[in-house]
């Protein structure tokens, strides 16, 4: 371990294996907190490479509680958080809408670290059981089309890094690992990142982790597809990364100011999302969710973004997605 940390002190990059070894030690609670802080700081200042991120993610997945992985195509739709904009819970809402459009989604999330209301805060407010067993969660994906995996239940070892992270009060590699360590191991993923500098490296990381099809996005300051500006996309298809830019017009929607999709605390967000999923959402709110569902649908082979967007809007207006929220709340 000393050799690995010394390598970081010299601003040298670790191999995937070395990174996996380092994070394995962290997750098992075997690394001295001072050395852990030093390693996390050195990685941050140097800038984490796809090899280092993939190695860390593999270490966390190897130490996670097991999950009965489906053998069909299924996805996660998730943002790193930390974009500082406190928008409504777009990816969580999009998960239900995507399921109502016929996709399978196993969403991995946590309580909010930076925004007023993280995905689990919202689900909690709808009465959805966050401590659902792995078996019940799997049957929800099978039968309802959507389920939620609560990170602490599967990744108990992350607690060993918590005091160090809280004391450091700065972003570390852990801030980007969450979306990469879904214990269900989906083969399709739409991941939003808080900085456009992360788009390409995270796509390269996903390629190393064997994703079948995925897209990493940054939307003009947001960790999701934007309706207030351009969205930078790095999409993995057939083992190759394609980079392109999308505008609201590509989805057939109007441009809206960021203020139009501001969120609040869990109760306010619950009211907004309930309206959205029962046909009472504003045009901006409907568009914001629909463009994210549309890109996720593309990853399942539905290539027409405008048709996908319209289907997502129709599903929200029909109330079909809200029925899935209720079903998941009754599930277990």
Swiss-Prot record:
Q: How is the cofactor bound?
A: Binds 2 magnesium ions per monomer.
* Entry keywords, A to Z: Amino-acid biosynthesis, Aromatic amino acid biosynthesis, Glycosyltransferase, Magnesium, Metal-binding, Transferase, Tryptophan biosynthesis
Q: Alphabetically, which GO biological process terms does the record hold?
A: L-tryptophan biosynthetic process
Which EC number applies? 2.4.2.18
Signal peptide residues are none
Keyword Magnesium belongs to the record = yes
Q: Which GO terms describe its molecular function?
A: anthranilate phosphoribosyltransferase activity; magnesium ion binding
Q: In which pathway does it act?
A: Amino-acid biosynthesis; L-tryptophan biosynthesis; L-tryptophan from chorismate: step 2/5
**What are the annotated GO cellular component locations?**
cytosol
Q: What Pfam families does the record tag this protein with?
A: Glycos_trans_3N, Glycos_transf_3
Reactions that this protein is recorded to catalyse: N-(5-phospho-beta-D-ribosyl)anthranilate + diphosphate = 5-phospho-alpha-D-ribose 1-diphosphate + anthranilate
| Cofactors required | Mg(2+)
Binding locations of 5-phospho-alpha-D-ribose 1-diphosphate: 79, 82-83, 87, 89-92, 107-115, 119
Quote the record's binding site residues for anthranilate 1.
79, 110
Positions binding Mg(2+) 1 in this chain are 91, 224
**Where is Mg(2+) 2 annotated to bind?**
223-224
Binding positions (anthranilate 2): 165
User: Would I find Transferase among this entry's keywords?
Assistant: yes
Describe its partners and assembly state.
Homodimer.
HAMAP family from the entry? TrpD
What family name appears in the similarity comment?
Belongs to the anthranilate phosphoribosyltransferase family.
Give the protein's function.
Answer: Catalyzes the transfer of the phosphoribosyl group of 5-phosphorylribose-1-pyrophosphate (PRPP) to anthranilate to yield N-(5'-phosphoribosyl)-anthranilate (PRA).
Q: What is this protein called?
A: Anthranilate phosphoribosyltransferase
Q: Which gene encodes it?
A: trpD
């Amino acid at each position: 371990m000393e050799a690995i940390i010394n390598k970081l002190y010299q601003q040298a990059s670790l191999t995937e294996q070395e990174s996996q070894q380092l994070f394995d030690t962290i997750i098992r609670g075997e690394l001295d907190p001072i050395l852990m802080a030093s390693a996390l700081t050195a990685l941050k200042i140097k800038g984490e490479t796809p090899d280092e991120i993939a190695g860390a993610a593999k270490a966390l997945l190897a130490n996670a509680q097991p999950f009965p992985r489906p053998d069909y195509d299924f996805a996660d739709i998730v943002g790193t958080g930390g974009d500082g904009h406190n928008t409504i819970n777009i990816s969580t809402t999009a998960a239900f809408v995507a399921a109502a459009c016929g996709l399978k989604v196993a969403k991995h999330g946590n309580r909010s670290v930076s925004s007023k209301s993280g995905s689990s805060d919202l689900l909690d407010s709808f009465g959805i059981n966050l401590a659902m067993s792995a078996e019940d969660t799997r049957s929800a994906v099978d039968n309802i089309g959507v389920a939620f995996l609560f990170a602490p239940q599967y990744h108990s070892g992350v607690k060993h890094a918590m005091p160090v992270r809280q004391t450091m009060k700065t972003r570390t590699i852990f801030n980007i690992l969450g979306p990469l360590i879904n214990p269900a191991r989906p083969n399709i993923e739409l991941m939003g990142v808080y900085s456009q500098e992360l788009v390409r490296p995270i796509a390269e990381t996903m390629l190393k982790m064997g994703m079948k099809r995925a897209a990493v996005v940054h939307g003009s300051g947001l960790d999701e597809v934007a309706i207030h500006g351009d969205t930078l996309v790095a999409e993995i298809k057939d083992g190759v990364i394609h980079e392109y830019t999308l505008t609201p017009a590509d989805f057939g929607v109007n441009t809206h100011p960021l203020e139009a999709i501001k969120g609040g605390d869990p109760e306010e967000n619950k009211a907004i999302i309930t309206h959205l999923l029962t046909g009472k959402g504003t045009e901006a709110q409907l568009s914001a969710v629909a463009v994210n569902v549309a890109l996720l649908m593309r990853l399942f082979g539905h290539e027409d973004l405008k048709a996908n967007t319209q289907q997502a809007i129709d599903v929200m207006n029909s109330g079909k997605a809200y029925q899935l929220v209720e079903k998941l709340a009754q599930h277990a």
